[in-house]
């Protein structure tokens, strides 16, 4: 049974069962269609009544379809029904009030002066610009392509000219066919096997039971945002020959505004502005300054005096603001189909990925919070913390030269407890969980992306052959070769020239990485010098917490250096990328992205790597300290360990960076737009209110970043790395990332809707090179977390002590009772008389016992001074080292095996999606066969009419 194009009536779907059971629009006709044998008894009166009711609904449907556009791709289908009145009603109402329809349309700045032709694109130039001849040729060729054009001067600056462009139906149809724009041709009809009929009845009963339950608060309000999903129609590449197969109820709204702008931009990219084979395209005119700006229009104001619930949305921008960019809907799902319709697939995919990433952070944040709370609840039962807090008789050696005093181990009680919050028995489990989480996140994102790509008609979409960058063309215009794709001659870059440029670029990257290392070295020197300064500070609070004060100030200085170097790195990455001379814009974008990510990743994480793996590891021991340039003694860890320094580094950097990024994303455009409005008020006086048309309002907004979505993706990718790479040391990182992303989604939405010009609706199948970077970060996170657990934390030393040296040695137990004596076993003894002259402290320690101290303790596994080999490594040191190396190997192999197993078990495409794709392919082929059959029948009729004989190929 073939599905007709009117398969959806009043929101109810026609469902066919292969064995013959039929559901029509919610009317139950439980009769079997038996191909053979006697017919079943049927109550024809009930069928007749059902058919009469169906006929009424069909008439209502046709009346609605005549008044409004198609519910599949109509650009106004998401607006409030109250705004979808007929044109004749609008005209009569407006004429009664003394206003005509053209005047109404003209006043909102979205149409030409006639009020009928919608503005699809805006070009801006200055009359004082000397490139007049190029513009005239370009605009003459624009008219030759069939585009309509009008010009308007600015209300505040007569030197600024706005060129309004409109694409008629004939132009849109011609280029939509060339661009393979997919349009709706048939509503979707889902075939259900007979065996699922019983389950569908159960689902209906469950849905009735759920009616009294509260609605899902995260779902968008259907009254405000009806028909959210745009996947209720099958689509096919548009063809003017098969135009009658497509669902067209209104030619003006058949192509939505984003598609119209994309088609116009496609035309502008192929129009010549000067004689010559390479003098073509709008991008080159923007580069040489002939035009100052080019952008599609926003669809009116994003604010309204009336409530959206009572009066409906005035336009899609207003609808996006109320349902997406407003802070009041921060907890609701994103209207991704509306975002895609307004901004295009590329921006829609970014917000889909960001929303998916944020949603996947919920389990990671919950488990991380659980690990932290587990540390809180087990704090009083931690044997290690108890021993540190009760060790009033253990005197620790000074942590710096001269000015640092001796201190009791019990003075580190608070730091030992804080360390236990992050370094406890659940840390290893959380590290394994996060490694698996990263894999699951990426695998399920591939499935989610596939569903989005299908719903948004991106499955079979392929990027067009890209144009050559003007810079590449100007550099290599003298050397040409034949393009194997287009068959046309094009500029060519020699292999030797390309290699030499890549070598220079790689050298520049290496040099900038050395600059980062130098900055880290400067931070290390600052920490070494400052700890002694703070130890001699006159304020007791700072003097007694000199190491914490040193770490805190060093992190803040490091953050400032990071932000300053980011500005430098952007300029260097731009210089090196231009030096490479990439051939196309996508090659340029990928090269620039890779450099910027590498620079910023190293810049952001270099100090963190130093604290995690080098701080306190190569300091020597009292009496034989290692020094920088034979002068500065390397910094030691706090008596409670180095993990607290790593936690402070990650927490401060993460909070400060996310706060700064959010301010720059929203605050900077707000300040710029406020400054623009302020200049206008100063020029025209505050008492004069000017009503700007939409094109001038949009021109005064900030243009989208020159690098597109690069900054948005980079911020989130760096956050993903910060969340996964050192998560074993900071379990609260996913929670901070989740809170930030909830704000980030609405900030980005607000910025796109209110502060930026409307970007061109670009298409993309995926998130591009960023997916490969995410996979690389996932692999790196496994390695770093293995090293953090084995090297930075005390998990392995505690485990070795419990099974080998503690009270439970040889018994196979590792509880808290087995940790008795661990603190004493992890500290070595040093004879104070063995201090070097420049390391000997000013105090002799008599304030502790009334007599000068003879011995002090330090963190290490070394022999006492009276042994055969003074201060040599003990056997326990080698056992701990072997256990650490073994843990790294076992942890990495185990987690990588789990990651690969998960990747293998999770298919990239859901099964139902594969079936839907096959169904759509079948219907498209059927449509083509029907069109071909109609053509042949038409030819046969014409031949019979003309009396010409024809040859039958098939019997």
Swiss-Prot record:
The keyword Membrane applies. Disulfide bonds: none annotated. Belongs to the anoctamin family. Has calcium-dependent phospholipid scramblase activity; scrambles phosphatidylserine, phosphatidylcholine and galactosylceramide. Does not exhibit calcium-activated chloride channel (CaCC) activity. Keywords: Cell membrane, Glycoprotein, Lipid transport, Membrane, Transmembrane, Transmembrane helix, Transport. Residues 72-100 are annotated as: Disordered. Pfam families: Anoct_dimer, Anoctamin. One of its GO terms (cellular component) is plasma membrane. It is a multi-pass membrane protein. Residues 1-352, 446-505, 569-595, 737-768, 907-955 are extracellular. Glycans are attached at residues 83, 105, 257, 288. It is found in: Cell membrane. The term 'anoctamin' was coined because these channels are anion selective and have eight (OCT) transmembrane segments. There is some dissatisfaction in the field with the Ano nomenclature because it is not certain that all the members of this family are anion channels or have the 8-transmembrane topology. It catalyses: a 1,2-diacyl-sn-glycero-3-phospho-L-serine(in) = a 1,2-diacyl-sn-glycero-3-phospho-L-serine(out); a beta-D-galactosyl-(1<->1')-N-acylsphing-4-enine(out) = a beta-D-galactosyl-(1<->1')-N-acylsphing-4-enine(in); a 1,2-diacyl-sn-glycero-3-phosphocholine(in) = a 1,2-diacyl-sn-glycero-3-phosphocholine(out). It comes from Homo sapiens (Human). Residues 374-424, 527-547, 617-715, 790-885 are cytoplasmic. GO terms for biological process: calcium activated galactosylceramide scrambling; calcium activated phosphatidylcholine scrambling; calcium activated phosphatidylserine scrambling; chloride transmembrane transport; establishment of localization in cell; monoatomic ion transmembrane transport. This is Anoctamin-4. The chain crosses the membrane at residues 353-373, 425-445, 506-526, 548-568, 596-616, 716-736, 769-789, 886-906. GO terms for molecular function: chloride channel activity; intracellularly calcium-gated chloride channel activity; phospholipid scramblase activity; protein dimerization activity.
